[in-house]
Regions:
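Conserved ABC ATPase signature
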Residues: 143-147, 151
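Conserved ABC ATPase "signature" C-loop
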Residues: 221-222
Length: 282
């Protein structure tokens, strides 16, 4: 499979910071995959997301080493405008993504297209398509600042998708939503991934990570502490040392193993857990 993200020995320290936020981070992401980044607060996840879309080094200034490549482009020598054709970021707080110059949701969705010479007709067509995808057709004439948090999150995701990126980076973009709103946004993201978009997602919901991820990377104190399939990462006892709350059915499987039940592998999905427990109790 083609590697669309390649991070090699990347370190970064913000200007005037007293410590290095990212330390010799290396990993790659395959085209069309669902790649999840997990870790405790302060482990460097958001900084890494900023590096993947070019906000580091072009917006956040500091000292760096190593390289970050998106497709064939070196982030350090590419402009953010050029990178936005390939990779888009959705922030944890959707209000941080608003332009604050757009008077309507339609203008907010179209804001990024203005840097790429898109015709008015094409712009209207793209806005209509993204609004339908995000189920916000009825909000196009509304002021973004008057919307609910869940509605603004849809607008933020839509304003990223309108650029038609091949790679979507999500920095805990459902953290401020209620459970229903969170699942609605996640369902959209999952469908986009099934259609071929590469997804890099920071998330604290380990059951959701176990359910959807092709690869899971654990961050701790600015370093990569584990990298593998959900089965590999959640079955490793070392994972919990980095503030990861592993899924309950993994804990249950481990408890059954400790109690003497013959479970060759730990379950990382609920259906696996039910099947294994039934077999163990026969």
């Amino acid at each position: 499979m083609t590697k669309v993200i390649r991070v090699e020995d990347f370190s970064f320290r913000y200007r005037d910071a007293d410590r290095t936020t990212l330390k010799r981070v290396s990993f790659s992401v395959e085209q069309g995959s669902f790649f999840c980044i997990v870790g405790a607060n302060g482990s460097g996840k958001s900084t890494l997301c900023n590096a993947l879309v070019g906000l580091i080094p072009h917006y956040f200034v500091g000292k760096s080493r190593g390289s970050v490549r998106i497709k064939d482009s070196d982030v350090a020598t590419s402009t953010i405008a050029d990178l936005s054709r390939h990779v888009g970021l959705v922030f944890q707080n959707p209000f941080n993504q608003l332009s604050y110059t757009a008077g309507t949701v339609a203008e907010e969705l179209a804001f990024g297209l203005g840097n790429h010479g898109v015709s008015r007709e094409t712009m209207h067509a793209k806005v209509a398509r993204v609004a339908a995808l995000m189920h916000i057709e009825g909000l196009l004439d509304k002021n973004p600042l008057e919307l609910s948090g869940g509605q603004v999150q849809r607008v933020a995701l839509g304003s990223t998708l309108i650029m038609e990126p091949d790679i979507l980076v999500l920095d805990e973009c459902t953290a401020q939503l209620d459970p229903l709103g969170s699942e609605e946004i996640f369902d959209i993201v999952k469908r986009l991934n099934q259609e071929g978009i590469t997804v890099v997602m920071v998330d604290h919901d380990m059951e959701r990570v176990a359910r959807c991820a092709d690869q899971v990377m654990v961050m701790g104190a600015g370093r990569v502490r584990a990298l593998g399939t959900p089965e590999e990462v959640f079955a490793d006892p070392e994972t919990v040392k980095w503030g990861i709350d592993i899924p309950d059915y993994v804990k249950l499987g481990r408890g059954l193993q400790d109690a003497g039940f013959d479970l060759p592998d730990l379950p990382v999905r609920e259906d696996q857990a039910v099947r294994m427990i039934r077999e163990a109790l026969r």
